[in-house]
Amino acid sequence: MLKSILFLCLLAPATCTSGAQDAAAPAPEAGPPAMFPHPGAARYFFAGQANIIFQAHAPFHSPYEGPNSLLSRGEYKTSMIGTIYTGFELVRNPRYATDAIFDVEAAGGRGLSEALGLAGFTNLDVVRNPSLGSTPYLARYEVHQVVGLTDTMAESERTPYSLETSLPQRRLEFWVGRMSLPDLLDLNSIGTDSHLQFLNWSIDNNGAWDYAANTRGYTDAAVAEYTDHDFTARYALAAMPTVANGIDLEYNLKQASGQNVELELRRGPGIFTQALRQRKGAVRVLGFVNHADMGDYREQIQLFLKGLTPTPDITAHAPKPTMKYGVGWNFEQEISENGRVYTQFGWNEGQHESYAYTEIDQTIAAGGDYAMKAFGRPNDKFGITFVTNAIKRDHQEYLKLGGMGFLLGDGNLNYAREDIVEAYYNYHAWKGVYYAFDEQFIAHPGYNQDRGSVMVESVRMHVDF
């Protein structure tokens, strides 16, 4: 399947006319243009996407390397991912709609240094276990249920996870099945889409949110959502992996689970001018509590210092459920017809093992994007953001003493925050075909000021079918 999708990607631009658009170009569509029409009136939903990312970096300063280091020699890698989205409206009652959703996906290629050595890795599409191969798999299978609490309806954008084009203004929604939690939580219209926006996974998702997921980023979960005009509350209960960054899930929820609560207000703060308050904006606050068989950094350091282990090993502990918790905050605001800004903050307690997403205990990000409509390119976009990531003292000491995480481990650590600047230009070539040019500057890769800095260049081709 993946090879067929990628062949169509490469074939598509050959049939297009010049990408030049004059000042009289039409306004952007409600959603990104696609290769084929997606009729909103149909009971079925059928779409697809393919994303090909080429990344490279030149040699950079590095007095030493460990098993989990970003390689200091120059390297280049290509990742590929293709998805087929399907859905069917089982019940079309406006107040009590029911959808069945099935998505098939295939991922191939590699990440730089096998996606090791960076807390904020440069490519969200990379699977962190290359031995899984590129065999297609069922990424999502879920049921979506709407329970209307009013007869007043509001227009809604059709998505692969919600097929309705209108929904009750006050409603409950439920999703049950296999999904990725960032499909529904911690969304941000400026920086959550590695297909058309930023590539770095500590920008596209809150890096300190150690959300329940297997290696591919999916879990079995139940999500409940309450919406009332410009306010939404969400709760998610999800299965954790059996081991850190593992492909298998633990279904004994008494032993392991991920619980998440999010509150969202789609209204500009009162400190804004009246003009800004009338533009689109949102504030989201997220809290999570994970239970799993996670190691304790301080305990492993003490065992090493007592001479009981040759190096600190976060996985070498008696099986026992432990708890990890954290909070996240993200804010976005439209400031003009074409310009938007956002900020993001995340924190977790950091004492226990980074388990499912990445090795970040605190993150702060700020950036924005600008649509090039004024330049006759209504579907082109430029974006830039800065993110700074950190880990707690016990995590720092663990890495300094030679401990390995599932992503990091230089064999030593001269600690500093990992700082990243990313900028991209996304060029709309024809219908659903896009090319992006992306640059990422990374200071202190893997929190190590002895190494780097490093510049990562990327070219992305994306097709929406």
Stretches with model-predicted labels:
Residues 140-152, 384, 453-465:
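Outer-membrane beta-barrel "beta-signal"
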Residues 264-265, 286-321, 349, 353-442:
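Outer membrane beta-barrel transmembrane domains
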Residues 44, 78-84, 137-143, 172, ...:
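Hydrophobic, lipid-facing positions within transmembrane beta-strands of outer-membrane proteins
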Residues 34-46, 58-59, 87-100, 148-171, ...:
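Short loop/turn motifs that connect adjacent beta-strands in outer-membrane beta-barrel proteins
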Residues 50-56, 102-106, 174-178, 235-239, ...:
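Transmembrane beta-barrel strands of outer-membrane/channel proteins
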Residues 88-92, 145-147, 178, 225-228, ...:
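Residue-level signature of outer-membrane beta-barrel architecture
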Residues 116-133, 137, 152-264, 313, ...:
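Surface-exposed coil loops of outer-membrane beta-barrel proteins
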Residues 201-331, 338-341, 345-352, 359, ...:
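Signature for the C-terminal beta-barrel architecture of outer-membrane proteins
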